[in-house]
């Protein structure tokens, strides 16, 4: 039995069916796409479709029984599942729910959002029938994280800040085209400059240094030379992204508490906290 049919679940299914082992996949949603469906911003359309095809191909195998719209603990208890006598129960329920922020008071903070509902909003707010969570993008936002998902959130906030300034001035404004070209090049074709828009911009707050951002993988058996190259590649990847989307990065910094209407930080790169 495999609980969850997206990336992790379908990978397990592939390995098992390759060995001739029958699988039952239980999925809480209608389709087994997990965060691929709405965890990726809408400009990742080609990647999303490719992943859909991969998962569909695996789940449609003759040795697979797919059970959608079934939640463990709600539609069927874990005790019931345990007593069914499965040879193996594999949990692949993924990151459908954001990990709670360690400073509990932050949830009372105006305009505080977790990544999952934030990206869901971005993917759907333009649809006429949209009735989901509302997000109010403000200037001087901070994004706390350091992986690819947090960079996507920084890109969204920057793109939305620019959209607020120029959408009424550009016929057929296209936020996806702006993502593909980058903010400076997109504005340039309309004789506009980011510096003239009066935007302070988004800041990405990361607790480690840029070389440790998980933007490229480093194999466990990597040589010291390869490790150094991969770390340099991480900084290069981030710098290229900064050039295109113009957000800022505060490395070796993490929030430690709240003070009235702002976050307090500690930074290894400075003697004092900042607010």
Predicted segment positions?
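A Rossmann-like FAD-binding core segment of flavoenzymes
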Residues: 52-68, 163-267
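Feature captures the FAD/FMN-dependent oxidoreductase FAD-binding
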Residues: 56-103, 256-264
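Single conserved hydrophobic/aromatic residue that forms the stacking wall/gate
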Residues: 265-275
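N-terminal Rossmann-like FAD-binding beta1-loop-alpha1 element of flavoenzymes
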Residues: 1-19, 154
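Conserved N-terminal glycine-rich FAD pyrophosphate-binding loop of Rossmann-like flavoproteins
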Residues: 30-50
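Glycine-rich FAD pyrophosphate-binding loop
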Residues: 21-32
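Glycine-rich dinucleotide-binding loop and its adjacent helix/turn
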Residues: 98-190
